[in-house]
Curated annotation (Swiss-Prot):
Residues 99-160 form the S4 RNA-binding domain. This is Small ribosomal subunit protein uS4. Part of the 30S ribosomal subunit. Contacts protein S5. The interaction surface between S4 and S5 is involved in control of translational fidelity. GO terms for biological process: ribosomal small subunit biogenesis; translation. One of its GO terms (molecular function) is rRNA binding. Gene3D superfamilies: Ribosomal Protein S4 Delta 41, Chain A, domain 1, RNA-binding S4 domain. One of the primary rRNA binding proteins, it binds directly to 16S rRNA where it nucleates assembly of the body of the 30S subunit. InterPro entries: Ribosomal_uS4, Ribosomal_uS4_bac-type, Ribosomal_uS4_N, S4_RNA-bd, S4_RNA-bd_sf. The gene is rpsD.
């Protein structure tokens, strides 16, 4: 998938569900899908046909990719690795997506949305085990320590993020120290700890054809 540069709210409308790409705004009546719950484009309102079979599987894959800002080749690699591993393929796929550094930064409450977390990582504001990592897709491991770098802690943006994420619930597989902008990975995420509106079995069926 090429990097998406258009308004991300159009992606939610395209998928017909909230992808939670803009943080707190997604939980308000300002969310685009609350105002225009139909596909973007001139004929968006007319696209009401029920999607079944392959189309349903494809849409589930696209939706999941977009939620995590994963590119097509990355997503396929995640699936192939999950399929070769020991465990339930769909759950292991989601586990790899959750272990992306940009997602972990978001889950820890260091960003109000995955898109913002991705930018923080790319701009060099995040360290893993004391070393700067600027690759959003970097896979964290158990016992890894993730932190906002010392030189970045004075950013005005972090004060805004702290206020916006003050009620964020951190999943059980992560430990966070909000005051010092650091956290760690205590375990690999279980399926019941991944609160995402995803039917991973549809994705498994798609790639297994």
């Amino acid at each position: 998938m090429a990097r998406y540069k258009d308004a991300v709210c159009r992606l939610c409308r395209r998928e017909g569900t909230k992808l939670f790409l803009k943080g707190p705004k997604c939980f308000t009546d300002k969310c685009a899908i609350e105002k225009r719950n139909f596909a973007p484009g001139q004929h968006g309102k007319d696209r009401k046909a029920k999607i079944v079979g392959y189309g349903l599987q494809l849409r589930e894959k696209q939706k999941t990719k977009r939620m995590y800002f994963a590119q097509e080749n990355q997503f396929r690699n995640y699936f192939e690795k999950a399929a070769k591993g020991q465990g339930v393929t769909g759950e292991m796929l989601l586990q790899q997506l959750e272990r992306r550094l940009d997602n972990v930064v978001y889950r820890l409450g260091f960003a109000s949305a995955r898109r913002q977390a991705r930018q923080l990582v790319r701009h060099g504001h995040i360290a893993v085990n004391g070393k700067k990592v600027n690759i959003p897709s970097y896979q964290v491991s158990v016992k890894d320590e993730i932190a906002v770098r010392e030189g970045s802690k004075e950013m005005t943006l972090l004060g805004q993020i702290k206020e916006l994420t003050s009620h964020t619930t951190v999943p059980g597989w992560l430990i966070v120290d909000r005051d010092n902008w650091k956290g760690s990975v205590s375990s690999l995420p279980r399926r019941d700890e991944i609160q995402m509106p995803v039917n991973e079995q549809l994705i498994v069926e798609l790639y297994s054809k």
